Amino acid sequence: MSEQFEMIAKTFQGLEEILAEELTALGANDIQIGRRMVSFTGDKRMMYKANFCLRTAIRILKPIKNFTAKDADEVYNQIQAIPWEEYLDVNKTFAIDAVVFSEEFRHSKFVSYKVKDAIVDYFREKTGKRPSVRINNPDVLLNIHIAQTTCTLSLDSSGESLHRRGYRQEAVEAPLNEVLAAGMILMTGWRGECDLIDPMCGSGTIPVEAALIAKNIAPGVFRKGFAFEKWVDFDADMFDEIYNDDSQEREFTHKIYGYDNNPKANEIATHNIKAAGVSKDIVLKLQPFQQFEQPKEKSIIITNPPYGERISTNDLLGLYQMIGERLKHAFVGNEAWVLSYREECFDQIGLKASQKVPLFNGPLECEFRKYEIFDGKYKEFKSQEEGEEKKEGEGEQAPRFRERKEFKPRREGEFKPRRDGESRPRREGEYKPRREGGDFKGGDQRDRKPRGEFRGGRDSRGPREFRGNREPRIPKKEEE
């Protein structure tokens, strides 16, 4: 039996339950929900699958040591006691991310320096040589988390944040994070059973993530690589098997519609959709929401309208008034989900939300609200809807956000919220300098064929071909 070990999947606040459900479906064990994280146990294959398949995880950490420390010297001694040759070659590079919630350790950079010193001194004493530190694209990325005096040192198996799927070619200003977009879609219970509409789709993040969910395409298939591919115990054959397994992918018989009134956004969305290989599933149209008409088929709206950071208040309130008007007159019999962080914007919609889910979009504390659009009174609408479902004899219904399985809470003392006035470390994905994706040019790294549609049709009967270094995932633009 393969060795089982603990792992931690980091995510955004508000997506923890969705992530736990994903891990359950993946076959993970001992799932416990914490704040912006979910812990679980599994083997090496599970770690590879978690990185490759999870839509709402930012990164997957593998803890290698838990200890308590009251000062920097204790941290140094505990780190130096680790047999580092099991995790790092002296000729390889490494980097350290520190996350600190502690009165004893107030500066995360100082903690990083102490960890670095302990590792360097370990190798210098053992071999007379030392590994080098490389901030961008290191061979091994370490994460140390300190909550008061409780310390956890982990290997970061992901490297570049998992929200960087690899299909995004360009972006509009302040694009929606891919992990958040996927989490929003999964919260609604939609899995491709009807058409999906984003009337303000920007660079196309929601439509692309929706297509990947509907077709059950793993989000990791577009990535250049993962940090674990540079580990000393990397099993290339095992990961190739996971990468090449498309047996869970499925057909999508409906359509996803993306609208926007910005020509540049429409152009960018077109490139991103093509890079993801889902152009056949998404219909893009340059159209303002004012011209939105009642869809012929049952549909769901999931959208992330502007919040007002770059729009005047009057224009913003007018926009949300228009959203409410279009929903009431051109989306009857369907449901719409809207993300925003301003209460006055929601007020302008003029509809009563049947569900409100708190979410964070970067530093903004938002709400994701569900609106059920109907004619007449709400009670009549619900009784008619329930009667139709009973008459049709439908079995399982799409899962509802409030009816999820309960998971064990994370043990106390870990990932505590900060006190008032206490400095807050950077959230995952927030204002973090981009760490370039793995270069993976070494001879022992086996690159895989990208799946973008511009690479031609794929033979589903056999594995993807390996063609050396991965090619760009979208053709270069022809010179005019």
Predicted regions and their residues:
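Non-catalytic nucleic-acid substrate-recognition regions in nucleic-acid-modifying enzymes
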Residues: S2-P138
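C-terminal catalytic and target-recognition region of SAM-dependent MTase-like enzymes
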Residues: Q287-R404
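A short, flexible beta-alpha/helix-coil linker loop
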Residues: F101-E104, S161, P306-R310
